[in-house]
Amino acid sequence: MENTVQPSTGQTTSPTQSDRQWAAGAHAGALALALLTSWAAGIAGAVAAFVVWMVVRDKSAFAAEHAREALNFNVSMFIYAAIAVMLVIFTLGIGIIVALPVWIVLGLMWLVCSLIATFKAYDGHMYRYPLTIRLFK
C-alpha cells in the first residue's frame, strides 16, 4: 500500500478504506456510466468522475486526486474521439480509414486503463493515465 504525506503535519498516512472505495468508485463509475451510455459519447464517463470529485474533494485528497485523474482521462478520450469524427467529416468520409483504427485503439486503451486505475485505487496506489490532458487541476 502506498503511503501519502500530509502537507500540514508532514506525517505519512495510508488512505482509509473509505478513501480507497471512493477513489476506485470514481474510475469504476466513469467506466460503468460510459459503457451504459455508449463509450463513443465519452463524456458520460466524465460526469461520474466529476460527481465523485465534487463529493470528496474537501474530504479526501487521495480520492479527490483519483476522481480528478478519471475526469481528465475521460474528457481527454472524448476530445481524441471528437477529433477523429472531425477528420471523417472534413475529409468527406475518407478519414474513416484513419479514424476507425484510432477509435478501436482509444476504446481498448480506455477500457484497460480504467480497469487498471480502479484496481490500483482500491489497493491504495496512485495511477496516472497515459495520454491525458490535465484540464482540471
Q: Positions of the model-derived regions?
A:
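Low-complexity, intrinsically disordered extramembrane tails and loops of integral membrane proteins
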Residues: M1-Q21, T132-K137
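Juxtamembrane transition segments at transmembrane-helix termini in multipass membrane proteins
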Residues: E2, V112-K137
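Membrane-helix interfacial "entry" motifs
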Residues: D19, A61-E65, I96
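Hydrophobic alpha-helical transmembrane segments in multi-pass membrane proteins
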Residues: A23-V47, N72-S114
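Hydrophobic aliphatic residues
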Residues: A32, M54-V55
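Membrane-embedded alpha-helical segments of multi-pass transporters/permeases
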Residues: W53-M54, L115
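Amphipathic, cytosolic membrane-interfacial segments at TM-TM junctions
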Residues: V55-Y80, F119-Y129
